[in-house]
């Protein structure tokens, strides 16, 4: 079982867009799951009108009206990133989308910068709901590291609380990965890769949620997005080790800063 206290402080990136209540409601759900303290971050002036809007939203969602609100000035994304650093936020929650073109949801600028420049965990919702829908299917992109193992434990913890149907643990293998492995004399059969991935999962011990391992092959890392859509996943989970590449996305997953196939949880 994972230690939910890893997320002692959760904050929601606040705007007064038509979907603000929905994003705040999703954040409340996550707060309840992890037993965390929830605060709000707002880039703008602390006026009576703004305070009344926050008070109304908190009241509508049965959240404490004395919840902390961290005010910042300037560029929205930069302000949110400053507040995260200043107040030691463990997990930031935000709406993901700016627009949708040809059925591909494109990340908004704030969400993109939180994912790209942030040093904490990020959870982005593509279609937040006032009454949050259960997260039935998870896809976890695995790497073989202690950080990824801890991230998978945390993922399974949330999946169990959500009474999820299945967690897919996948390993993305691109054509470039295979060519590099062959050059280094590390080529292996698909069955070997799946056995290694299965062992990675089994090493966690007792698992309360149905779990399935898959090795996904393709020309680029975008094959992961195709898989997410094929299984109709509700949450894509990506472990980003702060000790590697400063916790940034690996090259084969950089497409996530542009296109997001479903709700996304980046665990740092």
Regions found by a protein language model. Give the residues of each.
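Structured core of small recognition/catalytic domains
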Residues: 165-235, 247, 252
């Amino acid at each position: 079982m994972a230690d939910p206290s890893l997320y002692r402080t959760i904050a929601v990136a606040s705007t007064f867009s038509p979907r603000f209540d929905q994003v705040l409601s999703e954040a409340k759900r996550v707060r309840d799951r992890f037993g965390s303290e929830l605060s709000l971050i707002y880039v703008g002036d602390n006026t009576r009108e703004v305070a009344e809007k926050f008070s109304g939203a908190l009241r509508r969602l049965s959240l404490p009206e004395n919840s902390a609100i961290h005010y910042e000035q300037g560029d929205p994304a930069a302000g949110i990133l400053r507040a995260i650093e200043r107040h030691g936020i463990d997990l930031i929650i935000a709406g993901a989308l700016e627009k949708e073109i040809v059925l591909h949801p494109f990340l908004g600028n704030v969400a993109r910068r939180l994912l790209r420049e942030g040093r904490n965990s990020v959870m982005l919702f593509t279609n937040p709901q006032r009454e949050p829908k259960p997260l039935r299917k998870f896809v976890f992109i695995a790497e073989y590291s202690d950080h990824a193992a801890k991230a998978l434990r945390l993922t399974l913890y949330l999946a169990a609380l959500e009474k999820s149907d299945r967690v897919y643990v996948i390993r993305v293998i691109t054509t470039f990965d295979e060519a590099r492995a062959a050059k280094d004399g590390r080529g292996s059969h698909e069955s070997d890769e799946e056995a290694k991935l299965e062992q990675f999962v089994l090493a966690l011990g007792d698992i309360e949620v149905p779990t399935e391992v898959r090795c996904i092959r393709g020309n680029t890392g975008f094959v992961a997005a195709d898989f997410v859509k094929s299984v109709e996943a509700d949450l894509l989970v990506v472990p980003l080790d702060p000790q590697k590449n400063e916790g940034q996305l690996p090259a084969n997953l950089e497409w996530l800063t542009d296109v997001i196939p479903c709700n996304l949880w980046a665990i740092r």
